């Protein structure tokens, strides 16, 4: 309904700091400042066509070569400067418009308001939600189940509101409005805790970790459960582009062929002359979040062996992920192994921090006290 309009070389940061990253190309370069979480990517139904349009585990390295990215760097796929019809575009002047108000937003806002006013969904509210989902599952074999049956089973206020909360996530992924939705629902802290716990629990399973004394301890006897989530994504190269062998929902046993023979291919290796793109490759999707080692990363000393002579290994949660919500987790979470339930009652401070230049020129009147901003 309304977009912020730009023209090439005269404005527009979309494709520069938001969208699929492009390291170098005839159409310029750009690196997204916004990544999506694996818990979000895995929340989609497999046949929801918004998934592929929203989440991508690759980026462009050159005009004709892609590189895979891990679960920490899931790309918002709705915009890409490689889709531009002109070359030699300034990096910060892509001319890609940015949506301000979409028709789907109007439909979902109407459905949400109707549910609140009537303390439950009316037929009109359900119809609005069906319209949005009808497009999302237009080509799905389970379309009737995902549209009509799904919505018709939402018959009370709470279940319909939860459906709206989820639908807005799936519909507007990467469009930079999710935080404000969560704030107005008073659901921001809960959403962060859900993400932290999801990543921790899934990664513990696939890395054979258990909690012991506030630490992640490796247990080789712990059975790996197929949770319908892929700890690794396997792929092949076809004409320089990545073709994934499995999706987010397909577990592959990396101890069995052909997956145990798969190799990694870093971006620096791709840039090397004579690099081989043959054979099955993989990128870590969830393995990245907790690294397992026999050495304490703080003291650089070995953990030693247990009573049976087995090498002791422990896991450490990815610091960048752990501190992504430092304003909420500060003072409560240091390793990721803690009970995070108390965080649900804590207010997340990151709403609209005051720019540092404004603070500096305010003669001490303004501050970001309470934001717990951490330069890390």
Regions flagged by a language model, labelled:
Residues 1-59:
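Hydrophobic-face positions in mid-chain alpha helices that act as interaction patches
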Residues 1-12, 49-376:
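Acidic/polar-rich alpha-helix caps and helix-coil junctions
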